[in-house]
Amino acid sequence: MFTEQVLNVIILLQTATVTATAIPASGCNAGDVQCCKSVQKADSAGGAALLGLVGIVLSNLDVFIGGDCSPITAIGVGGTSCSSQAVCCENNSFNGLIALGCVPINLSL
């Protein structure tokens, strides 16, 4: 029973981590396009854990942060893909560990 509850919570967290509306990749004027394995609100438990990894304290917790991100460089070229969540992030200065101020994007638009 406990295992089933834990599994349900994990599934809920995975499906609820990104709720922002995706924008086309061409509309990414805030920063670089990234492919992140996780994208969460900064005020969530997962977001707090990511921020704690690098000792960041944010004054605005109403932003999305990406975890384990890598740049996507050739938008519009065949073969561009992201098997996780494609995002446009304002601050990617943490060597891919986390990215701040992320907005989900749609690579197919």
From Swiss-Prot:
Disulfide bridge partners, by residue number: 28-88, 35-82, 36-69, 89-102
First and last residue of the signal peptide: 1-20
InterPro entries reported for this sequence: Hydrophobin (IPR001338)
Annotated Pfam families: Hydrophobin
Compartment(s) of residence: Secreted; Secreted, Cell wall
Gene Ontology molecular function, alphabetical: structural constituent of cell wall
Glycan attachment points: 91, 106
GO cellular component labels: extracellular region; fungal-type cell wall
Keyword tags: Cell wall, Disulfide bond, Glycoprotein, Secreted, Signal
Main location: secreted
Oligomer and partners: Self-assembles to form functional amyloid fibrils called rodlets. Self-assembly into fibrillar rodlets occurs spontaneously at hydrophobic:hydrophilic interfaces and the rodlets further associate laterally to form amphipathic monolayers.
Function: Aerial growth, conidiation, and dispersal of filamentous fungi in the environment rely upon a capability of their secreting small amphipathic proteins called hydrophobins (HPBs) with low sequence identity. Class I can self-assemble into an outermost layer of rodlet bundles on aerial cell surfaces, conferring cellular hydrophobicity that supports fungal growth, development and dispersal; whereas Class II form highly ordered films at water-air interfaces through intermolecular interactions but contribute nothing to the rodlet structure.
Family statement drawn from the similarity comment of this UniProt entry: Belongs to the fungal hydrophobin family.
Name listed for the protein in its UniProt record: Class I hydrophobin 18
UniProt organism field: Pleurotus ostreatus (strain PC15)
